[in-house]
Swiss-Prot record:
This is Urease accessory protein UreE. HAMAP family: UreE (MF_00822). It holds the Pfam family UreE_C. It is found in: Cytoplasm. The keyword Cytoplasm applies.
Length: 205
């Protein structure tokens, strides 16, 4: 069995024909987060994936096997939720609550994509978003899953937060509420990079 133990850095340019001829390793997101994995190439060949710990593979990555051969990574179709909203404010609130729960999210133009989760689907629907189950490749934003506590200062935000907590309490039977009230205004703008095409900010007043 061949061992795949190296990933070529994204800034290294390879001939397109060379990459196209390489066999594909098609993996769902959960499998792409594992540095040790027994996998099967699309050709049917079994391989062992042994990469540095903490490696998260992305669609289009090129790997190198122990015999020097190339293998290209492809994101598999998997069960996901497509989240849309009638306005930017609702979608932003949905994104906030997903981020507050450390949920990996792929950001698109007017749409959020996350791994299928019926609890999150229920929460997002109650927040006013439209949630559709689909089968699609999932490639969330890299390195953007920091957690956080609520810093809302307006009644509408507090209602949204309480609703989100209620949904999770119903499903899990206990509360994880983290409330921090302040007497001063503050504003935290978080730019989400070039993939965030709809100018997604988290501003709190």
């Amino acid at each position: 069995m061949r061992t795949i133990d190296k990933r070529i850095a994204p800034n290294v340019r390879l001939a397109a024909t060379l990459v196209a001829r390489a066999p594909a390793l098609t993996l769902a997101y959960d499998a792409r987060c594992k540095s040790r994995l027994a996998a099967t190439l699309d050709t049917g060949e079994d391989v062992a994936l042994v990469l540095p710990r903490g490696t998260v593979l992305r669609d289009g990555d090129v790997l190198v096997a122990d015999d020097g051969a190339l293998v290209r990574v492809a994101a598999a179709h998997e069960a996901v939720l497509l989240v849309r909203a009638p306005d930017a404010l609702t979608l932003t609130r949905a994104a906030y609550h997903l981020g507050n729960r450390h949920t990996p999210v792929e950001v698109g133009a007017g749409c959020l994509k996350l791994e299928y989760d019926p609890v999150l689907a229920d929460m997002l629907t109650r927040l006013g978003a439209t949630v559709e189950r689909a089968s699609a490749p999932f490639q969330p934003e890299a390195g953007a899953y920091g957690g956080g506590h609520r810093h809302g200062h307006d009644a509408t935000f507090a209602e949204d937060y309480a609703l989100a907590q209620q949904v999770f309490d119903e499903h899990h039977g206990h509360s994880h509420s983290h409330s921090h009230d302040h007497d001063h205004d503050h504003d935290h703008d978080h730019q989400h990079g070039p993939c965030c095409s709809h100018g997604h900010h988290h501003g709190h007043r």
